[in-house]
Amino acid sequence: MYKIHTYISLIFCIPLVIACFTGSVLVYKDKINNILMPGVIYVADGNDEKRLKFDELREKIEKEYPHHEIVGWNIDVDPQKTDKIWLLPHGAGEKEWACVYLDAFSGEIKSDLVPHDSGFIGVITELHENLLLEKSGQILLGLTAIFAFIISISGFIVYRNFWANLLRLRFSRMATFMSDSHKFIGVFSTPVIFAVALSGAWWELRFMFMPPFDNSKFVIGPQIYDKNISIDALVQRAASDMPGFETHYVSFPFFDGANITLYGQKPQQSFLHSQYSSTVTYDKNSANLIDVKDIELASKTDKFLSTFRRAHYGDYNAATKFIWFLCGLAPLALSVSGIYLWIKRSNFKRRKR
């Protein structure tokens, strides 16, 4: 079991460290973006105005970017954050998503239109999601997440009496310290790594089990939905069609067969589910109600999958975010201590011969 733990760790340590380290950075991506782009991520302090109407804001965006179409609109659960508007250029073919930040209280566009993978956080996100290798990177990271389970389980077997001296950290010799710290960090970080690895493996590999997505012939333009449909009216109707529903993301049609879908949450829903767990869908031409998916009434499978988002990000509260941040750094520390112990053990065996 020691050999299984060691050699799998050596094979996958680099992608695992990259994925987890970048994940730690992304836990605080809004804070980092606020430093890199001051005055963009959050609305002005002391703003006691009411949000402007969605239709008014949509008109402003369309006037500012006449050759683009809004395909996504994120309204953060934190009212102090600006809205994030996703746009695609008009025309057919595969296109790159771009976004702007919008102060929904003043109507001010707070940033330039930038590609989704631009800037420091954009590059970190791409590294985290696919190692900058697109689908090949997704597969590699998916396999890494699966083998992270094996590494963790085999580690528990190797240190099966870990509970006896779990809190002991000896500094007498480097090898002793590395062994104690390896066990200590591994045991305490494993539950979070389990949750992150499970959700990460699902997101990275599920495209392999879904029909191919070809959006090359879909034409982006003003005709993707009837512009006479009021977004404000849909948001109000959604709160009626699913009592208590709060909209946090509006998805507009950007592929064949898509309609207008509002993602959100209900105040009484379980803390395990995110602010995007429930959906209400309306026809893109008539605004007639098509579907209501209340996560509290969903199947056990859908409920389980819905917990992945918060389990992956750890954004239950400020304390859990910090714990997830620390656990994201754990594979780096475990790799350093593990490689040191492996070299030490190999040298000892060589001298013994």
What are these regions (language model features)?
Residues 1-353:
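Conserved histidines in hydrophobic membrane contexts and catalytic metal-binding motifs
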